[in-house]
Amino acid sequence: MNGVTGRMGYRQHLVRSILAIRDDGGLLLPDGSRVQLEPLLVGRNAAKLEEIATRHGVEHWTTDLDAALADPRWDVFADFAVTSARADALRKAIAAGKAIYTEKPTAETSAEALELAQLAAEAGVPNGVVHDKLYLPGLRKLRRLVDSGFFGRILSVRGEFGYWVFEGDWQSAQRPSWNYRKQDGGGIVVDMFPHWNYVLEQLFGRVESVYARTATHIEHRTDEQGTEYPATADDAAYGVFDLAGGITAQINSSWAVRVDRDELVEFQVDGTDGSAVVGLFGCRIQPRTATPKPVWNPDLKDERDYRGQWLEVPDNEVFGNGFRAQWEDFLQDLVAGRPHPYDLLSGARGVALAEAGLRSDAEGRRVDLPELQLPTQPTPRLQADSGSDSDSAASADNADSASAASDSASASPDVPEVVQHTETVGARA
């Protein structure tokens, strides 16, 4: 586990996922048996690693990533370290035959992200990318509605995400200052568009084009040391996404907006037979048979309680931590020898959407997204099979696919590549 001294790597991936599974007796398999997990903590700060290991009863930790990758005892390489070091670490892990589980973005450019997906496919290495939003209660309820045919023909999706992030002067900011410096990898497009890509494509359809406008609404902020600095990164993005099947989605993302909704992110889905308003936890529906019939009349105050005319979807099951839920799915897929659906290719599509959004803003037009495909897609193998299958894994030149993925950025030299800094500290290759 590379990068466990940072906030997300420690809290969500180590403590609430891997250690929680370990403390429950191991990974529960469909036949009722369990597979126990043993983590190896990797990072650059030996003192922090030792403190975490002691606190949680973890036996193994190291600051030597290369030695960890060379050790055959470890089957899975999980990366939560800085994005700038991720691609090199993933390449080494793939070459070592490790299964891959990684945070987003998987690389700094879509071409590099696609290259990683191709390398993993050629090596037959199982791989997964964190798609945590799909495992949250609200979106799982939405998935049930979509699968049940509740909406009829889905027409549109509207999303609102964000909240007011204080400037850091008279009140401290609740997000780190690097988020607002483009040169440090900040910006809401590179942060949120990869999330919107997997939410849209997994629930509604592939993103075929994007029109986006970005803004830096707050031009000066104050950092953690009390020093004012120019905000060079976008703090808001307004996107329109054309999806396969004729669905139109529009999502506003902003760190300069005040919240007047039930949750920090909400999606409204409208279809011919019904609509839903979904957050991270809640889900309210209005079927066609219970839809009111408003009449526009600006001369009279409308006394209807429109929000009160929606029905709350019950939980009907116990929802656990979303990060742990995906970890369990990934590990069960790994043990069973089947591909994980949220893989490095899916991660590359998220990076490509962020690049296309930045290009759309720079050029003031809609940008089409080519469908990313790998020239070869052999069946991923288990770590235990590495010795016999590696030589026979199919190999092909992926230059054409990588070129298609990077066209959205290369056509405009002023469009920045997607670079995302994280707070997580991990070992550099």
Q: Which residues make up each language-model segment?
A:
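Predominantly a Rossmann-like dinucleotide-binding segment in NAD(P)-dependent oxidoreductases
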Residues: K133-A231, G364
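Glycine-rich, aromatic-lined ligand/substrate-binding cores of catalytic
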Residues: V199-S209, T214-H217, E228-S275, F281
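Intrinsically disordered, low-complexity terminal tails and inter-domain linkers enriched
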Residues: A384-T424
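C-terminal glycine/acidic-rich active-site capping loop/insertion
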Residues: T222-E224, Y229-P230, Y238, D242-L243, ...
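Short acidic low-complexity segments
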Residues: P30, H60-P72
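N-terminal Rossmann-like dinucleotide-binding module
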Residues: M1-H56, R428-A429
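Beta-strand-loop-alpha-helix segment that lines the small-molecule cofactor/substrate pocket
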Residues: D75-V76, V82-T83, A87-L134, G149
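Core-facing hydrophobic residues within beta-strands of well-ordered domains
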Residues: Q36-L37, W74, I154, V207
